[in-house]
């Protein structure tokens, strides 16, 4: 450990940074990402004009957390005037986009099949469609409850994926353009290759613009959520390295589900688990204390569900938790 004064062990720094537009909460499955992202959104709602909370995790836990049904449209969270939530499936939104815009007949379908044969294009376009939708809604700050680590940073490769798709379509168009146009005139309809090309190009522009914002520490930060165990800490280190390689700012770690046994408690399992957690917590401090705000949150005796419990829990993000003596 260094002699430097440790950073404030709260997420107050995020609330104070008014320039932030995009905040991601990510980590391994089951470490409390959703509770953390919901709690952070609640705290942001108290100091920012309007907040949108988005789940891109296929499990979609926002509805469970707030005990309120959310879908693909931004819906006001009960009890708030300026906090909205939505649950989206990138692949689902892509399918809807195709179905609603496929007016080009059979050849249009063929061009889409050719484009989607490139790995990742479907996800990339789904993500672009979501970002287009989100950008059209004027929110002060957007909080992402992301899919478990591994899927979290997939979107960073999307611009190059779409570049490949554009290149492939362009080549195909050059080779088969006259034949496609002849067949198209027989089938009737518009020019599918140009339509598809224009669609991919507009998606690529959106993703490139958004990715540039994601790499701006004034606009974007990533909150790593973990528990004090070997695998979770290892995953967090990998996540931080990956974020650093993509130039995405991260300087907050939430360590969730910590045990604080009461004095005189004879629970052997609690004691063993507490000692294990303290060992990995020390490792986390050794690794990150100089550059990260490390927030410690307790293991609770009941689930954090419903607005009131989330509000109560969210206070621990801005005021360090003190275990009862």
UniProtKB/Swiss-Prot annotation:
SUPFAM superfamilies: P-loop containing nucleoside triphosphate hydrolases
Broadest EC class assigned to this enzyme: hydrolase
Residue numbers binding ATP: 28-35, 229, 256
Location of the active site: 57
GO cellular component entries: GET complex
Main location group: cytoplasm
Keyword entries, A-Z: ATP-binding, Cytoplasm, Endoplasmic reticulum, Hydrolase, Metal-binding, Nucleotide-binding, Transport, Zinc
Binding site for Zn(2+): 267, 270
EC number: 3.6.-.-
GO molecular function, one term: ATP hydrolysis activity
CDD domains xrefs: ArsA
InterPro entries, sorted: Anion-transp_ATPase-like_dom, ATPase_ArsA/GET3, ATPase_ArsA/GET3_euk, P-loop_NTPase
Subcellular location: Cytoplasm; Endoplasmic reticulum
GO annotation, biological process: tail-anchored membrane protein insertion into ER membrane
One Pfam family this sequence matches: ArsA_ATPase
Assembly and interaction partners: Homodimer.
Family, similarity comment: Belongs to the arsA ATPase family.
Function: ATPase required for the post-translational delivery of tail-anchored (TA) proteins to the endoplasmic reticulum. Recognizes and selectively binds the transmembrane domain of TA proteins in the cytosol. This complex then targets to the endoplasmic reticulum by membrane-bound receptors, where the tail-anchored protein is released for insertion. This process is regulated by ATP binding and hydrolysis. ATP binding drives the homodimer towards the closed dimer state, facilitating recognition of newly synthesized TA membrane proteins. ATP hydrolysis is required for insertion.
Protein name per its UniProtKB record: ATPase GET3
UniProt source species: Cryptococcus neoformans var. neoformans serotype D (strain JEC21 / ATCC MYA-565) (Filobasidiella neoformans)
Biological classification of the source: Eukaryota, Fungi, Dikarya, Basidiomycota, Agaricomycotina
